[in-house]
Curated annotation (Swiss-Prot):
GO cellular component, one term: cytosol
Name this protein carries in UniProt: TPR repeat-containing thioredoxin TTL4
Low complexity composition bias: residue spans: 48-71
TPR-type repeats, residues: 211-244, 246-278, 280-312, 402-435, 449-482, 483-516, 518-550
Disruption phenotype: No visible phenotype under normal growth conditions, but mutant seedlings display increased tolerance to salt stress at moderate NaCl concentrations (120 mM).
Keywords: Phosphoprotein, Repeat, Stress response, TPR repeat
Annotated segments matching region Disordered: 1-120, 132-157
Top-level taxonomy: Eukaryota, Viridiplantae, Streptophyta, Embryophyta, Tracheophyta
């Protein structure tokens, strides 16, 4: 019989130690002769607060109620489980009880609860620790209830794979960081959080050659909340007995308590590889996968043949599957608010560390044009670095990691980070080998939009503003809600003197991204060109608050205020009423030609077809360029004026600037007429 099996048959000190760590109901604490009231406390809570948390009321409340003080009888597993030396039976109503063992309870001071780090839930401002009160003896409650920071996890090896239930309140550690003495990777450059220096007991245990004793020392460190030291000792135990699944399962619990769920999954899979029938590892894997939002993988390990699944986890799995199904249906029809609602419900159900669910929420925000929320949401997802070797989980028919990257790429593109978007979507293609149509579509779209933007930038830089506007327009045909492309095209219109169009595109960009500073700057400048000083002042005042140290914004605001003040004192000159005015006398014609700025005269006849055809376009130009004076002269009604101006053919257009004629055109095209107006306007 192997070394790690023999302890289940020997009534030794090891067995007694294991039994002393079996967390049963609190009302059976009468048969433990060496019982002492101990409170290891939370590794994240000051010692001074431990007494309050150790009361019976506290032990039966939310965060510490994940099984240790439920008052419910334990359910014995039907699975014929092997007793692996040193696997702590833990804090679960469904933990198997060794035949013949004495049921014991712990007083409130000896309370133990699952500790697996702080669940990360996106609440609209990124991932954040979520605390809740939950009177149920099993965790997984919603994060919507009020926090109870006084009741904290105490850091025991977790039961039946139940690594952590949602709603565990935590506080930031104030312990110093020290370099780890071990050789394994403990994250963050081997800098670990401890209570100070590595304890002498830990150093001594690390030098032992008995893997069981090393493991026991690791368990002690775990219960004290010293997860880094516990990991170092479990590593030592594994190096002495590599094929012991209990050691790897315990290490998985410590990793999960440190918030390193993916590595915990890897360790559990190693435990299952060592012993495919090891129930505890399967249960722990199921619980981890539930937190990661991977329903299929969770079901695979929760419903192992011959194993009675934990009913709480089974219910959580079924609820998660329901929310994912409803989310998928809502996404198909574009009901993005329902998508957000179902994702929030899935997270509250326990999938509190799922990158793909947070990415789905980010996608919904993006489709609702809430780009800031989408960016905050997607940036809360940690760097993808999956370790497990299970068949990759899929969401909406896409491998989860690839889906996350696709959403990140689309958010990057919406914010103008085109190069980053291409890198991410290409990486998604390497992950999803099934060539999902959705991933392929995102890849093609991102590349084509980026190409249009690059082409537009090149044309703009060379001064070919009209062609650049067309290039940006091509990109907008592929991505109609890209605020960057709208803002870039607005710059083209501004350079062409088409300020009304510039304002329109800036408005589009700001509808999509209300905090887009560059679009607001461009719109304010366009308002100034149009003489809409009141609107310009309003935009510059917003910019002044957003950019308090920007001297150019301050100067522009002052100029706009001065112009607004002067405008109220200016006389209402002929031609500034945004409509084409009629001129019928020679005197009025001379007055109009002497107006400041540009004056355009349209010599027409109501009986001439060409004149009538171009008249609506002249009205459009009048609205588009409000600083230009537009006039019309009916040659049939004003024969003297037509003769004085030598009008031979109609329609004829004459452009005056500062009282002098600068151009005359006969039967011009729409493009030639507008180009001529903008040329002299600039």
């Amino acid at each position: 019989m192997s070394h790690y099996r023999r302890h289940s048959l020997e009534p030794s000190i090891t067995s007694k130690f294991r039994d002393s760590l079996s967390f049963q109901r609190d009302d059976d604490v009468i048969n433990k002769p060496d019982f002492r009231e101990l409170d290891f406390g939370s590794p994240l809570r000051p010692r001074g607060s431990s007494s309050a948390a150790a009361t019976p009321a506290a032990s039966g409340s939310s965060s510490s109620s994940s099984g240790s003080a439920s008052g419910k009888p334990a359910v014995t597993s039907q699975f014929a489980r092997r007793s692996h030396s040193g696997e702590l039976s833990g804090l679960s109503q469904t933990s198997p009880v060794k035949p013949g063992s004495v049921n014991r309870n712990l007083k409130p001071g000896h309370r133990r609860s699952a500790s697996a780090g702080t669940p990360l839930i996106y609440s609209g401002l990124g991932f954040s620790p979520v605390n809740n009160n939950n009177n149920s003896s099993r965790g997984g409650g919603s994060g919507a209830t009020s926090p109870n920071p006084g009741v904290l996890p105490t850091g025991n090896i977790c039961p039946s794979g139940r690594i952590l239930k949602t709603g565990m309140a935590t506080r930031a550690s104030v312990r110093p960081e020290t370099l780890c003495t071990g050789t394994a990777n403990y994250g963050h450059g081997n800098i670990i959080r401890t209570g100070g220096k590595v304890s002498h007991a830990t150093k001594a245990a690390a030098e032992m050659s008995d893997s069981e004793e090393v493991k026991k020392a690791g368990n002690v460190m775990y219960r004290k909340g010293n997860y880094a030291e516990a990991l170092a000792l479990y590593d030592r135990a594994i190096s002495l007995s590599p094929e012991n699944p209990a050691y790897r399962s315990n290490r998985a619990a410590a990793l999960a308590a440190s918030g390193r769920l993916e590595e915990a999954v890897k360790e559990c899979l190693e435990a299952v590889r060592c012993d495919p029938s090891y129930a505890r590892a399967h249960q722990r894997l199921a619980s981890l996968y539930l937190r990661l939002g991977e329903a299929e993988n969770a079901r695979r390990h929760l419903c192992v043949s011959g194993q009675c699944p934990d009913q709480a986890d089974l219910q959580r799995l079924q609820t998660l599957e329901k929310h994912l199904r409803l989310c998928t249906e809502a996404r198909k029809i574009g009901d993005w608010r329902t998508v957000i609602s179902e994702i929030d419900a899935a997270i509250a159900n326990g999938a509190d560390s799922s990158p793909q669910l947070v990415a789905c929420k980010a996608e919904a925000f993006l489709r609702l044009h809430q780009i800031k929320d989408s960016d905050l949401c997607i940036s809360s997802i940690p760097r993808l670095d999956h370790h497990h070797t299970q068949p990759p989980e899929k969401l909406f028919g896409i491998v989860c990691d690839a889906y996350v990257l696709c959403v990140q790429a689309q958010v990057d593109m919406a914010l103008g980070r085109f190069e980053n978007a291409i890198v991410k979507v290409e990486r998604a293609m390497t992950i999803d080998h099934s060539n999902s149509p959705e991933v392929v579509s995102v890849l093609n779209n991102v590349k084509n939009v980026a190409k249009a933007r690059t082409r537009g930038n090149e044309l703009f830089s060379s001064g070919r503003y009209s062609e650049a506007s067309v290039a940006y327009g091509d990109g907008l045909k592929l991505d109609a809600f890209n605020s960057v492309l709208y803002c870039n095209r607005a710059a083209c219109w501004f350079k062409l003197g088409m300020w009304e169009k510039s304002v329109d595109d800036c408005n589009q960009a700001l509808r999509i991204q209300p905090s887009y500073t560059k679009a607001l700057l461009r719109r304010a400048a366009s308002y100034g060109k149009l003489g809409r000083w009141e609107d310009a002042v309003r935009d510059y005042e917003v910019l002044r608050k957003e950019l308090p140290g920007d001297s150019e914004v301050a100067e522009s605001l002052q100029r706009a205020r001065n112009a607004l003040s002067n405008k109220s004192e200016e006389p209402k000159y002929l031609g500034f009423n945004n409509e084409v005015e009629e001129v019928s006398t020679l005197d009025k014609f001379k007055t109009a030609t002497s107006l400041p700025g540009i004056s355009v005269f349209h010599f027409k006849s109501s009986s001439n077809r060409q004149s009538e055809a171009i008249s609506p376009f002249v009205n459009t130009l009048c609205l588009r360029y409000p600083l230009v004076h537009f006039f019309k002269v009916d040659v049939e009604e004003s024969l003297a004026l037509a003769k004085a101006e030598s009008i031979k053919k109609i329609p004829t257009f004459k452009i005056y600037k500062k009282g002098e004629k600068v151009k005359e055109m006969v039967c011009p095209s729409h493009q030639l007429l507008e180009d001529s107006v903008t040329h002299f306007l600039l």
